């Protein structure tokens, strides 16, 4: 590999750090969700974008919400637990059972997100990637295999229109 190859090399995942965070995600999820060990897990996040217009100044502000997302194929349930990037704590779980939701689908544009409408008034958009490098905003975890399994579950056994 020449100089240019080293200069433009993609960042590499620190698997030790990723594994430690995956274990911490599991610990938090299992403490919060009854029967948590029966669920498979991925890291996901939500984006809340607000726009502003002050005369000549226009813009937007984005808030990121970190999520531990668990799914169980046996009863077609997704559980979402809010957390923070350093995994120092988490909030209360929200359950989405396929039999109880209004609709669920994958939205490819403008962002690749898994959208769940539990009713007509609310929804959650779960964004998930195999790895995100920004540790200040996101949980540092590599999850290519888990994300592929979640995508398969969501698209083939959970989605409904």
Regions found by a protein language model. Name each.
Residues 46, 50-52, 61, 78, ...:
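Residue-level detector of solvent-exposed, low-hydrophobicity positions
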Residues 42, 107, 117, 140-142:
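A structural detector for beta-sheet-dominated domains
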Residues 2-73:
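Anionic N-terminal interaction surfaces
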Residues 34, 44, 100-101, 145, ...:
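Short linear sequence elements within intrinsically disordered, low-complexity coil regions
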Residues 5-16, 26, 133-161:
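Terminal and domain-flanking low-complexity segments
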């Amino acid at each position: 590999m020449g100089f240019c190859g080293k200069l433009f090399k993609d960042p590499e995942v620190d698997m030790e750090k990723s594994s430690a965070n995956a274990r911490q995600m599991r610990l938090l999820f299992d403490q919060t969700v009854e029967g948590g060990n029966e669920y498979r897990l991925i890291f996901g996040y939500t984006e809340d974008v607000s726009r502003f217009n002050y005369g000549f100044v226009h813009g937007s502000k984005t808030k990121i919400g970190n999520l531990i997302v668990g799914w169980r194929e046996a009863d077609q349930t997704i559980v979402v637990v809010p957390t923070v990037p350093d995994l120092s704590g988490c909030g209360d779980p929200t359950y989405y059972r396929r039999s109880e939701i209004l609709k669920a689908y994958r939205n490819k544009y403008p962002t690749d997100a898994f959208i769940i409408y539990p009713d007509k008034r609310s929804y959650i958009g779960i964004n998930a990637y195999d790895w995100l490098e920004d540790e200040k905003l996101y949980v540092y975890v590599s999850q290519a295999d888990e994300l592929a399994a979640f995508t398969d579950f969501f698209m083939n056994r959970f989605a409904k229109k």
